[in-house]
Amino acid sequence: MFDSIIFDLDGTLWDSTVPICESWNVVLKRHAEIKRPPVTINELGECMGLPMYDIAAKLFPLESKEVQTAIMDELCAYENEYLSEHGARLFDGLENVLSLLSKKYRLFIVSNCQDGYIEAFLKAHRLAKYFDDTECWGRTRTCKGESNKILIKRNNLCNPVYAGDTSGDAESADYAGIPFIYAAYGFGNVSSDKY
């Protein structure tokens, strides 16, 4: 029996593609030197779940690594501020589900996002009361599976399960040696029948 649930964030708890797209395009308007059209929701959807600098390489392939890193850092900083104020679309019934689950399980979030992104989600929607801890790529600079391991060890979890919506989420659970629950309503696909 599980004693805790570790959630992915994007595509599992909320869909933030529209406000992220809005915030990124505000920043990109300040940078005429970046030669690309505005970021689209479809482009952003294809990037969900990737580490931040992999997204930068995908969206800004003509720019140097240094420029990719600098622009992504600026995009993420403004994104955190924007999401903290405006929030995003929570999946139907999320707070009710979290309230029910938190009565039986300890709840956590592990995401490939920048530092401050999970906090923006929690602040905008007043959901911090349901989660014991969080971890992200922005703090660990490691793969999601390793971030899962760090959170599991730090919280002395014995039987956690990871819930996510992409094959990368499934792989991160496998890497951490924990079961995976597939959130089929999310952004991605998981090809294995074992979920």
What do these predicted ranges mean?
Residues 81-109, 115, 119, 145:
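Short, acidic loop-to-helix structural element flanking the phosphoryl-transfer center
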Residues 2-92:
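N-terminal helical cap/lid subdomain that shapes the substrate entry/recognition surface
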Residues 162-195:
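Acidic, Mg2+-coordinating phosphoryl-transfer loop and its flanking beta/alpha structural elements
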Residues 4, 144-170:
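Conserved Lys-Pro-Asp/Glu-containing loop-to-beta segment of HAD-superfamily phosphomonoesterases
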Residues 44, 127-142:
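A short, structured active-site edge motif that brings together acidic residues
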